[in-house]
Amino acid sequence: MEVTAHYIGGKPFVGDTGESFATLNPATGEVLAHIEQADERVLGHAIESAKLGFSVWSSMSAAERSRCLLKAAQLIRDHNDELAELEVRDTGKPIQEASVVDIATGADVIEYFAGLVNGLGGEQQSLGSNQFFYTRREPLGICAGIGAWNYPIQIAMWKAAPALAAGNAMIFKPSEETPLSALKLAELFTQAGVPDGVFNVVQGDYRVGQMLTAHPEIDKVSFTGESGTGKKVMADSAATLKPVTMELGGKSPLIIFDDADLDDAVSAAMVANFYTQGEVCTHGTRVYVQRAMYDAFVEQLKERTEKLIVGDPMNMETQIGSLISKSHLEKVLGAISSAKESGATLLTGGFQVTERGLEKGCFVAPTVFVDCRDEMPHVQNEIFGPVMSVLVFDDEDEVIARANNTQYGLAAGVFTQNLSKAHRVIHQLQAGICWINTWGNSPAEMPVGGYKLSGIGRENGQETLLHYTQTKSVFVELGAFDSPYA
């Protein structure tokens, strides 16, 4: 099988490094491609290419950059089905998700920042009749994007959009588990007229990430992944004082009060745990249900969860796809075993699905544990699989304290018909992304990011553009220079 490699300088690039790895379809075990592992020489070539691209791109007007990005977004939409199928084969997620969410929401963000950048300007202030100052928002230079495997192309677009809109170049490293869609994205950027070298893709494992974060000519790092790796990224970046944006792990609370709409609450809990087979950092895996609603909630949850369709991700009827890898499958099954050992009651699921031709994949039945306690390991630790923990609570103050008793702070949600209560509770929850009577919505206009160990900085929304620029202050003297020396 031919070795697929990198995308540097507006075209595919093979570095002849002598090392490669296989990327698999996790649903079937099929080898999709062999990918070249980048080395220092490949990264050096990418940086030189990015320098050239940056010199051209940053000198273009905001309107010119905007036109290129809008064209890229349209090309991405035109290739939606192709990109979605590629994403499904590489991730194992259902095609019904990828075809309507992953590609479209990435294109949304590119369009959003393409429109926003035209208004990116500085300020001017007079300091008297002969003096004034003004400021400029200037690009940082070369930004590194390090992606995750659960939403490969969406994450690539979420990182590239503000970086490129602000005039930067980017070197993007996809996860070695899902390396394919970023190459197609790079190709579409080139077709849209983005200058060569502005968006480059280098492939490889953690070693490539370490080279990027430590490199003195990388001016910023944006990372999506788990919190432990995020600490290492930040430490490596600190050596050259480069700014970082990090969207990390979570163990988010979903709080359901007894006046909530039962059907909506169950629907949200299912989406907040089983969408993308549970491999979403913002999932609400700690579901707190007020005692008066608990029994009815659990009864409906069991009935509806057992109707979910686990199957071939390429089948439009499939609702639960394959986990990303055999090693991750073992981790999730281990967490399920731990939950049983800790005394939680298995309501439904809890096993690997192997019938109907799924034996070669990494499928886990949607799993719900009840009678959970806050101190149980599966309640405290991020599992990143289709495993829900349901906990009962009695009053508002109690559930707020319990919901906040975690090292994470990525997301939180509240379901209640009392909007005063909803806002009162949300304002006390220690989380960066919050929802009221819904779960998971993430429009391009809304900044997203975490508190505590769930991240630093934000993605999307107006403030994100500021993370990809730096302020230059210019003081102007119109009169004679007033020297203190004779």
Swiss-Prot record:
Its EC number is 1.2.1.8. GO terms for molecular function: betaine-aldehyde dehydrogenase (NAD+) activity; metal ion binding. GO terms for biological process: glycine betaine biosynthetic process from choline. NAD(+) binds at G147, A148, W149, K173, P174, S175, E176, E226, S227, G228, T229, G249, C281, E382. This is Betaine aldehyde dehydrogenase. HAMAP family: BADH. Keywords: Metal-binding, NAD, NADP, Oxidation, Oxidoreductase, Potassium. It comes from the Bacteria. Dimer of dimers. PROSITE patterns: ALDEHYDE_DEHYDR_GLU. K(+) 2 binds at L241, K452, G455. It is an enzyme of class 1 (oxidoreductase). Disulfide bonds: none annotated. It catalyses: betaine aldehyde + NAD(+) + H2O = glycine betaine + NADH + 2 H(+). It holds the Pfam family Aldedh. Pathway: Amine and polyamine biosynthesis; betaine biosynthesis via choline pathway; betaine from betaine aldehyde: step 1/1. Its cofactor is K(+). The keyword Metal-binding applies. Involved in the biosynthesis of the osmoprotectant glycine betaine. Catalyzes the irreversible oxidation of betaine aldehyde to the corresponding acid. The active site is at K159, E247, C281, E459. The modification Cysteine sulfenic acid (-SOH) is found at C281. K(+) 1 binds at T23, D90. Belongs to the aldehyde dehydrogenase family. Binds 2 potassium ions per subunit.
